[in-house]
Amino acid sequence: LISVLMLTACSEDKISGDGVDLTNEFEITDDPNDPVQHERYQIFKEYNVPVLFNDTIAKRQIGTDLYGKPVMQYETVDLNWDFDSYSNSVQYVYDYLKTDESKMDALRFVRKFLEMCSKRMRPFSIMVANNLTSKPESSSLAEKQYISGFRTLVFYNVSNLSDDDIKTTARDVIYDMVAQKVKANKDLCTMFEAVSSKYYFRSWEELGGCTTCLEWCKKSTYISTNNLYYGLPYNAVEGSTAAYKFDFVDLVTSRKMVADKEEAKEVLSTIVQEIGNYGFIRGNKNTGSYSPADAEEDRNYFVQAILTLGDEKFNERYGRCALVMEKYELLKDFMVNELGLEL
Protein backbone atom coordinates (compact mmCIF):
# COMPACT_ATOMS: atom_id res chain seq x y z
CA LEU A 1 0.00 0.00 0.00
CA ILE A 2 1.02 3.66 -0.11
CA SER A 3 2.06 5.58 2.96
CA VAL A 4 1.26 9.28 3.03
CA LEU A 5 3.59 11.67 4.87
CA MET A 6 3.14 15.43 5.19
CA LEU A 7 6.30 17.47 5.73
CA THR A 8 7.22 21.12 5.63
CA ALA A 9 9.91 21.95 3.09
CA CYS A 10 11.65 25.15 2.02
CA SER A 11 12.28 24.06 -1.53
CA GLU A 12 11.04 21.56 -4.09
CA ASP A 13 13.54 18.69 -4.34
CA LYS A 14 13.62 16.51 -7.41
CA ILE A 15 12.40 12.96 -6.79
CA SER A 16 14.56 10.25 -8.28
CA GLY A 17 12.58 8.14 -10.72
CA ASP A 18 11.21 11.01 -12.81
CA GLY A 19 8.27 10.47 -15.12
CA VAL A 20 5.57 9.88 -12.54
CA ASP A 21 2.73 12.17 -13.49
CA LEU A 22 1.47 13.70 -10.26
CA THR A 23 -2.06 13.95 -11.63
CA ASN A 24 -2.00 10.17 -11.66
CA GLU A 25 0.77 8.89 -9.42
CA PHE A 26 1.15 5.58 -11.21
CA GLU A 27 1.00 6.82 -14.80
CA ILE A 28 4.37 6.67 -16.55
CA THR A 29 5.09 9.42 -19.08
CA ASP A 30 7.38 9.02 -22.07
CA ASP A 31 10.73 10.64 -22.76
CA PRO A 32 12.17 9.37 -26.06
CA ASN A 33 15.52 10.97 -25.20
CA ASP A 34 15.86 8.96 -21.99
CA PRO A 35 16.28 5.20 -22.70
CA VAL A 36 15.33 4.19 -19.15
CA GLN A 37 12.25 6.38 -19.02
CA HIS A 38 11.22 5.33 -22.53
CA GLU A 39 11.43 1.63 -21.61
CA ARG A 40 9.42 2.24 -18.43
CA TYR A 41 6.80 3.92 -20.60
CA GLN A 42 6.79 1.05 -23.11
CA ILE A 43 6.28 -1.50 -20.32
CA PHE A 44 3.50 0.61 -18.82
CA LYS A 45 1.80 0.94 -22.21
CA GLU A 46 2.03 -2.81 -22.94
CA TYR A 47 1.20 -4.24 -19.51
CA ASN A 48 -0.38 -1.33 -17.59
CA VAL A 49 2.11 -1.90 -14.76
CA PRO A 50 4.22 1.07 -13.61
CA VAL A 51 7.85 0.32 -12.74
CA LEU A 52 9.50 2.36 -9.98
CA PHE A 53 13.14 2.67 -8.95
CA ASN A 54 12.57 3.99 -5.44
CA ASP A 55 9.87 3.90 -2.81
CA THR A 56 8.64 7.46 -3.40
CA ILE A 57 5.57 7.40 -5.61
CA ALA A 58 4.86 11.11 -5.59
CA LYS A 59 5.17 14.35 -3.70
CA ARG A 60 3.05 17.44 -4.03
CA GLN A 61 2.43 20.69 -2.22
CA ILE A 62 -0.92 20.61 -0.43
CA GLY A 63 -0.75 23.99 1.28
CA THR A 64 1.40 26.28 3.38
CA ASP A 65 2.10 26.48 7.07
CA LEU A 66 1.74 29.48 9.40
CA TYR A 67 5.09 30.81 8.21
CA GLY A 68 4.17 30.61 4.53
CA LYS A 69 6.36 27.60 3.90
CA PRO A 70 5.02 24.80 1.67
CA VAL A 71 3.53 21.70 3.27
CA MET A 72 4.48 18.69 1.18
CA GLN A 73 2.69 15.36 0.94
CA TYR A 74 4.84 12.31 0.14
CA GLU A 75 3.37 9.01 -1.01
CA THR A 76 5.66 6.01 -0.59
CA VAL A 77 5.61 2.25 -1.01
CA ASP A 78 5.03 0.62 2.37
CA LEU A 79 5.54 -3.15 2.52
CA ASN A 80 4.10 -3.36 6.02
CA TRP A 81 0.55 -3.15 4.72
CA ASP A 82 -1.32 -6.43 4.31
CA PHE A 83 -4.76 -6.94 2.79
CA ASP A 84 -6.53 -6.11 6.03
CA SER A 85 -3.89 -5.03 8.53
CA TYR A 86 -0.81 -2.92 9.14
CA SER A 87 2.28 -3.62 11.21
CA ASN A 88 5.35 -1.42 11.56
CA SER A 89 7.42 -4.10 13.27
CA VAL A 90 9.70 -4.45 10.23
CA GLN A 91 11.79 -1.67 8.74
CA TYR A 92 12.73 -2.23 5.09
CA VAL A 93 15.97 -0.71 3.83
CA TYR A 94 16.41 -0.21 0.08
CA ASP A 95 19.67 0.05 -1.82
CA TYR A 96 18.59 1.80 -5.01
CA LEU A 97 19.87 1.14 -8.52
CA LYS A 98 22.23 3.99 -9.36
CA THR A 99 23.16 3.70 -13.04
CA ASP A 100 21.12 3.73 -16.21
CA GLU A 101 22.81 0.48 -17.25
CA SER A 102 21.65 -1.34 -14.11
CA LYS A 103 18.16 0.10 -14.50
CA MET A 104 17.94 -1.09 -18.10
CA ASP A 105 19.10 -4.56 -17.02
CA ALA A 106 16.41 -4.58 -14.33
CA LEU A 107 13.79 -3.55 -16.87
CA ARG A 108 14.80 -6.48 -19.09
CA PHE A 109 13.95 -8.76 -16.18
CA VAL A 110 10.66 -6.98 -15.47
CA ARG A 111 9.61 -7.27 -19.10
CA LYS A 112 10.31 -11.02 -19.17
CA PHE A 113 8.46 -11.50 -15.88
CA LEU A 114 5.37 -9.67 -17.14
CA GLU A 115 5.53 -11.54 -20.44
CA MET A 116 5.46 -14.88 -18.57
CA CYS A 117 2.87 -13.81 -16.00
CA SER A 118 -0.88 -14.17 -16.57
CA LYS A 119 -2.83 -10.91 -16.68
CA ARG A 120 -4.58 -11.67 -13.38
CA MET A 121 -1.26 -12.44 -11.71
CA ARG A 122 0.33 -9.12 -12.69
CA PRO A 123 0.90 -6.75 -9.78
CA PHE A 124 -0.59 -3.27 -9.55
CA SER A 125 2.94 -1.83 -9.61
CA ILE A 126 6.56 -3.01 -9.53
CA MET A 127 9.53 -1.51 -7.75
CA VAL A 128 13.09 -2.62 -8.56
CA ALA A 129 15.98 -2.09 -6.15
CA ASN A 130 19.60 -3.14 -6.18
CA ASN A 131 19.10 -4.86 -2.83
CA LEU A 132 16.60 -5.06 0.00
CA THR A 133 17.28 -5.77 3.67
CA SER A 134 15.21 -5.47 6.79
CA LYS A 135 15.49 -4.72 10.49
CA PRO A 136 15.18 -7.17 12.13
CA GLU A 137 16.92 -9.31 9.51
CA SER A 138 14.81 -11.74 7.52
CA SER A 139 16.17 -15.01 6.16
CA SER A 140 13.39 -15.12 3.56
CA LEU A 141 14.60 -11.84 2.03
CA ALA A 142 18.09 -13.28 1.65
CA GLU A 143 16.76 -16.45 0.03
CA LYS A 144 14.45 -14.76 -2.47
CA GLN A 145 14.70 -11.95 -5.00
CA TYR A 146 11.28 -10.45 -4.45
CA ILE A 147 8.74 -9.49 -1.83
CA SER A 148 5.08 -8.94 -2.54
CA GLY A 149 3.34 -6.03 -0.84
CA PHE A 150 -0.33 -5.14 -0.91
CA ARG A 151 -0.13 -3.19 -4.19
CA THR A 152 3.55 -3.35 -5.09
CA LEU A 153 5.82 -6.22 -6.05
CA VAL A 154 9.43 -5.41 -5.17
CA PHE A 155 12.30 -7.10 -7.04
CA TYR A 156 15.94 -6.91 -5.98
CA ASN A 157 19.22 -8.49 -7.12
CA VAL A 158 17.85 -8.88 -10.66
CA SER A 159 19.92 -6.27 -12.53
CA ASN A 160 22.90 -8.44 -13.43
CA LEU A 161 21.37 -11.63 -14.80
CA SER A 162 22.10 -13.49 -18.01
CA ASP A 163 19.25 -14.16 -20.42
CA ASP A 164 18.95 -17.73 -19.11
CA ASP A 165 19.00 -16.54 -15.51
CA ILE A 166 16.35 -13.92 -16.26
CA LYS A 167 14.00 -16.59 -17.57
CA THR A 168 14.77 -19.01 -14.73
CA THR A 169 14.39 -16.37 -12.01
CA ALA A 170 11.16 -14.99 -13.47
CA ARG A 171 9.79 -18.53 -13.66
CA ASP A 172 10.76 -19.28 -10.06
CA VAL A 173 9.09 -16.08 -8.85
CA ILE A 174 5.88 -17.03 -10.66
CA TYR A 175 6.04 -20.55 -9.19
CA ASP A 176 6.38 -19.09 -5.71
CA MET A 177 3.62 -16.52 -6.25
CA VAL A 178 1.21 -19.22 -7.44
CA ALA A 179 2.16 -21.46 -4.50
CA GLN A 180 1.46 -18.60 -2.07
CA LYS A 181 -1.92 -17.86 -3.66
CA VAL A 182 -2.83 -21.55 -3.46
CA LYS A 183 -1.73 -21.62 0.18
CA ALA A 184 -3.97 -18.63 0.96
CA ASN A 185 -7.04 -20.55 -0.25
CA LYS A 186 -7.78 -22.57 2.89
CA ASP A 187 -10.69 -24.54 1.42
CA LEU A 188 -8.59 -25.61 -1.55
CA CYS A 189 -5.72 -26.67 0.73
CA THR A 190 -8.07 -28.70 2.91
CA MET A 191 -9.47 -30.58 -0.08
CA PHE A 192 -5.99 -31.17 -1.50
CA GLU A 193 -4.65 -32.50 1.80
CA ALA A 194 -7.58 -34.87 2.26
CA VAL A 195 -6.61 -36.89 -0.83
CA SER A 196 -3.35 -38.23 0.67
CA SER A 197 -3.77 -37.32 4.34
CA LYS A 198 -3.09 -40.89 5.52
CA TYR A 199 0.14 -41.23 3.56
CA TYR A 200 2.33 -38.24 4.47
CA PHE A 201 5.89 -38.83 5.70
CA ARG A 202 5.79 -42.60 5.50
CA SER A 203 8.40 -44.78 3.84
CA TRP A 204 7.53 -46.39 0.52
CA GLU A 205 8.32 -49.71 2.16
CA GLU A 206 5.76 -49.06 4.90
CA LEU A 207 3.12 -47.92 2.42
CA GLY A 208 3.64 -51.02 0.29
CA GLY A 209 3.29 -51.76 -3.40
CA CYS A 210 6.48 -49.87 -4.29
CA THR A 211 8.81 -52.78 -5.08
CA THR A 212 10.39 -51.25 -8.19
CA CYS A 213 10.89 -47.95 -6.40
CA LEU A 214 12.59 -49.65 -3.45
CA GLU A 215 14.72 -51.86 -5.68
CA TRP A 216 16.14 -49.00 -7.71
CA CYS A 217 16.63 -46.66 -4.76
CA LYS A 218 18.95 -49.28 -3.27
CA LYS A 219 21.10 -49.94 -6.31
CA SER A 220 21.27 -46.71 -8.28
CA THR A 221 22.73 -43.29 -7.52
CA TYR A 222 20.33 -41.72 -9.99
CA ILE A 223 17.00 -43.39 -9.46
CA SER A 224 15.12 -41.99 -6.51
CA THR A 225 11.65 -40.56 -6.26
CA ASN A 226 13.22 -37.09 -6.21
CA ASN A 227 15.37 -37.39 -9.32
CA LEU A 228 12.43 -39.09 -10.95
CA TYR A 229 10.59 -35.80 -10.64
CA TYR A 230 12.87 -34.31 -13.28
CA GLY A 231 12.66 -37.21 -15.73
CA LEU A 232 10.90 -37.10 -19.08
CA PRO A 233 8.72 -35.40 -20.02
CA TYR A 234 9.52 -33.17 -17.05
CA ASN A 235 12.21 -30.62 -17.86
CA ALA A 236 12.45 -27.71 -15.44
CA VAL A 237 14.15 -25.40 -17.95
CA GLU A 238 13.28 -25.82 -21.60
CA GLY A 239 16.44 -26.13 -23.65
CA SER A 240 18.56 -26.69 -20.55
CA THR A 241 21.99 -28.24 -21.09
CA ALA A 242 21.37 -30.38 -17.99
CA ALA A 243 19.86 -33.13 -20.10
CA TYR A 244 17.86 -35.97 -18.63
CA LYS A 245 20.06 -38.99 -17.85
CA PHE A 246 19.10 -42.47 -18.96
CA ASP A 247 22.25 -44.00 -17.44
CA PHE A 248 21.04 -45.84 -14.35
CA VAL A 249 24.29 -46.64 -12.58
CA ASP A 250 25.24 -48.91 -9.70
CA LEU A 251 25.86 -47.25 -6.32
CA VAL A 252 29.29 -48.85 -5.91
CA THR A 253 30.67 -49.72 -9.34
CA SER A 254 28.92 -47.05 -11.46
CA ARG A 255 28.06 -49.87 -13.88
CA LYS A 256 25.06 -49.21 -16.09
CA MET A 257 21.99 -51.04 -14.82
CA VAL A 258 19.75 -50.84 -17.89
CA ALA A 259 20.24 -51.95 -21.46
CA ASP A 260 18.89 -48.89 -23.25
CA LYS A 261 16.73 -45.78 -23.14
CA GLU A 262 13.47 -47.70 -23.49
CA GLU A 263 14.19 -49.88 -20.47
CA ALA A 264 15.02 -46.77 -18.46
CA LYS A 265 11.72 -45.17 -19.44
CA GLU A 266 9.86 -48.32 -18.45
CA VAL A 267 11.46 -48.29 -14.99
CA LEU A 268 10.55 -44.62 -14.54
CA SER A 269 7.00 -45.26 -15.65
CA THR A 270 6.60 -48.05 -13.12
CA ILE A 271 7.89 -45.90 -10.26
CA VAL A 272 5.57 -43.04 -11.29
CA GLN A 273 2.66 -45.45 -11.01
CA GLU A 274 3.80 -46.91 -7.67
CA ILE A 275 4.08 -43.63 -5.79
CA GLY A 276 1.23 -42.17 -7.82
CA ASN A 277 -1.10 -44.76 -6.29
CA TYR A 278 -0.78 -42.73 -3.08
CA GLY A 279 -1.25 -39.40 -4.85
CA PHE A 280 2.43 -38.39 -4.92
CA ILE A 281 4.68 -37.26 -7.75
CA ARG A 282 7.95 -37.23 -5.80
CA GLY A 283 9.39 -38.04 -2.40
CA ASN A 284 10.34 -36.09 0.68
CA LYS A 285 12.88 -33.31 0.06
CA ASN A 286 15.32 -34.77 2.61
CA THR A 287 14.97 -38.44 1.72
CA GLY A 288 13.51 -39.83 -1.46
CA SER A 289 12.64 -43.06 0.34
CA TYR A 290 9.75 -41.33 2.14
CA SER A 291 6.64 -39.57 0.92
CA PRO A 292 6.42 -35.75 1.31
CA ALA A 293 6.44 -34.56 4.92
CA ASP A 294 3.15 -32.70 4.72
CA ALA A 295 0.53 -31.23 2.40
CA GLU A 296 2.42 -27.97 1.87
CA GLU A 297 5.52 -29.74 0.58
CA ASP A 298 3.28 -31.91 -1.59
CA ARG A 299 1.35 -28.89 -2.97
CA ASN A 300 4.52 -27.06 -3.91
CA TYR A 301 5.71 -30.06 -5.94
CA PHE A 302 2.39 -30.14 -7.76
CA VAL A 303 2.45 -26.41 -8.50
CA GLN A 304 5.92 -26.63 -10.01
CA ALA A 305 5.06 -29.72 -12.06
CA ILE A 306 1.78 -28.26 -13.34
CA LEU A 307 3.32 -24.95 -14.39
CA THR A 308 6.28 -26.67 -16.03
CA LEU A 309 4.47 -29.50 -17.80
CA GLY A 310 1.16 -27.89 -18.65
CA ASP A 311 -2.11 -29.77 -19.00
CA GLU A 312 -1.22 -32.11 -21.86
CA LYS A 313 2.13 -33.31 -20.53
CA PHE A 314 0.90 -33.61 -16.96
CA ASN A 315 -1.90 -35.88 -18.16
CA GLU A 316 0.56 -37.82 -20.31
CA ARG A 317 2.79 -38.47 -17.32
CA TYR A 318 0.28 -38.94 -14.50
CA GLY A 319 -3.06 -39.57 -16.18
CA ARG A 320 -3.26 -43.20 -14.99
CA CYS A 321 -2.71 -42.21 -11.33
CA ALA A 322 -6.21 -41.50 -10.00
CA LEU A 323 -5.20 -39.77 -6.75
CA VAL A 324 -2.60 -37.61 -8.50
CA MET A 325 -5.20 -36.50 -11.02
CA GLU A 326 -7.71 -35.77 -8.25
CA LYS A 327 -5.24 -33.31 -6.73
CA TYR A 328 -4.37 -31.97 -10.15
CA GLU A 329 -7.97 -31.13 -11.01
CA LEU A 330 -8.37 -29.22 -7.74
CA LEU A 331 -5.30 -27.08 -8.42
CA LYS A 332 -5.97 -26.74 -12.13
CA ASP A 333 -9.46 -25.33 -11.53
CA PHE A 334 -8.07 -22.68 -9.18
CA MET A 335 -5.10 -21.80 -11.37
CA VAL A 336 -7.16 -21.44 -14.53
CA ASN A 337 -10.36 -19.88 -13.22
CA GLU A 338 -9.03 -17.77 -10.35
CA LEU A 339 -5.49 -16.91 -11.44
CA GLY A 340 -6.10 -16.83 -15.19
CA LEU A 341 -3.22 -19.17 -16.01
CA GLU A 342 -3.04 -21.00 -19.32
CA LEU A 343 -1.90 -24.58 -18.75
Predicted segment positions?
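Auxiliary, metal-adjacent structural segments of Zn-dependent hydrolase domains
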Residues: D95-T152
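Active-site recognition of the HExxH zinc-binding catalytic motif
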Residues: T152-G208
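Acidic/polar, low-complexity intrinsically disordered N-terminal segments immediately downstream
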Residues: C10-R108, R317-L343
